[in-house]
Amino acid sequence: MHSLDEPLDLKLSITKLRAAREKRERTLGVVRHHALHRELGLVDDSPAPGSPGSPPPGFLLNPKFPEKVDGRFSAAPLVDLSLSPPSGLDSPNGSSSLSPECQGNGDLPPLPTAVDFQPLRYLDGVPSSFQFFLPLGSGGALHLPASSFLPPPKDKCLSPELPLAKQLVCRWAKCNQLFELLQDLVDHVNDHHVKPEQDARYCCHWEGCARHGRGFNARYKMLIHIRTHTNEKPHRCPTCNKSFSRLENLKIHNRSHTGEKPYVCPYEGCNKRYSNSSDRFKHTRTHYVDKPYYCKMPGCHKRYTDPSSLRKHIKAHGHFVSHEQQELLQLRPPPKPPLPTPDSGSYVSGAQIIIPNPAALFGGPSLPGLPLPLPPGPLDLSALACGNGGGGGGGIGPGLPGSVLPLNLAKNPLLPSPFGAGGLGLPVVSLLGGSAGSKAEGEKGRGSVPARVLGLEDHKTPLERTERSRSRPSPDGLPLLPGTVLDLSTGNSAASSPEVLTPGWVVIPPGSVLLKPAVVN
């Protein structure tokens, strides 16, 4: 019986199975032992197999056979990968881990065959993983050198640093002198290029300078600016040894060690304190200006009260605007879109937009020439965004009347190319405009639309909506009242009620969708 201090290691559950297997393979132990020696090229004169507690001599370093050890294994310490070793190979004292019944019968454990010691196969192209394959049905523990689990040597990609000779080159215009020490470069720039005369305007002519020739009104400002090129940081923190190019930055940094925050917010009721005046100024703007920090990307109208929130937005959406782009936007600002009103023609007047019903996406009756399942892509509504805001529903596009606006189905990724409106069983103009109908039919069809994007028609009475639909011509006599659902799944264009409408395509009524221009990065 096992004691509580001794780990079980699955010995109680597999004792009987292991004993039966060892009895069956007992007679084949000697044959397997010699076959293993022939495979490894070793010579062994002993007819009896090795002791149960010792692994095969070919896989442990034997001082008698140093030249006969397989070259695939090194002199590193052995690693046992077996989770439940069937033999006593993993015993620390070399004794057998068999059950007391097997030890009393004198049964010997089966020796591992040559198949059990197959070499490891690593996956090519995966240097960071330690994937290996163990032979199935192995009878013994697999011993591997510890060096097998060391990753292959990686080429350390160091950050590209400029050579010292290139760093100590004066990049002033028409200079290019070399220096051995940084202080020599700093003295050279200060003495020969930074002129003490005020008439020189203290202009920086360093190669690649972001100021583009703009000068300074004081010599000390010019000297501080030159440190950004020479990388000179003469002011060092005595606590953490950080260096700074400006003395003011060192003073602000020292406050992080002392905890001093002398700058208090002047807003009444706000007692926030800051270690520098710049942070206090940014905070004060949040009290007097409504979200002063805004995104400068054209078309993005996000504003924030904190500059860190704006930086997170720019990083998340990639709305980086360079200095040159900001100057171009100031010279030629983008036109602002007109505000939509119920009486203006900024939205598409009288245009029917066809979208797939959710039931059509999951295997409804297919349209002629329409591949199913449909890819998750939006319809191409670029042709609908050409309204210029004309009154009376006119001027939607050049050469097109106000109530006739063809859908651009040729560029639609949902439809095969070439695919026109004829594949829907309708001519091009049959998708647009309204038709004469009764007020009751319009109200009945309105309830059959599954969803409304923007309720712009709520500003008008039902009588005005009906009169507006009657004023538009009806090509081919198609009853397209606001809210009418077209049964396009069968190929015809007859109006259907929700009870008899099969899962197909849905037509959004005019006036319920507002098309807004958007800038996509």
Curated annotation (Swiss-Prot):
Ranges where the record places region Transcription repression: 148-171
Domain of life: Eukaryota
Compositional bias of kind Pro residues: 49-58
CC terms in the record's Gene Ontology section: cytoplasm; non-motile cilium; nuclear speck; nucleus; transcription regulator complex
Entry PTM: C-terminus cleavage is induced by interaction with CTNND1 and enhances by Src tyrosine kinase.
Zinc finger (C2H2-type): 168-193, 202-229, 235-257, 263-287, 293-317
Segments of skewed composition (Polar residues): 487-496
Site (Cleavage): 287-288
Distribution of this protein across tissues and organs: Expressed at high levels in kidney, and at lower levels in heart and lung.
Region (Disordered): 41-63, 84-110, 436-501
Quaternary context: Interacts with CTBP1 and HDAC3. Interacts with CTNNB1 and CTNND1. Interacts with SUFU.
Domain remark from Swiss-Prot or TrEMBL: The C2H2-type zinc finger 1 has a major repressor function and is required for CTNNB1 binding.
The protein, known as: Zinc finger protein GLIS2
Species per Swiss-Prot/TrEMBL record: Mus musculus (Mouse)
Gene that encodes it: Glis2
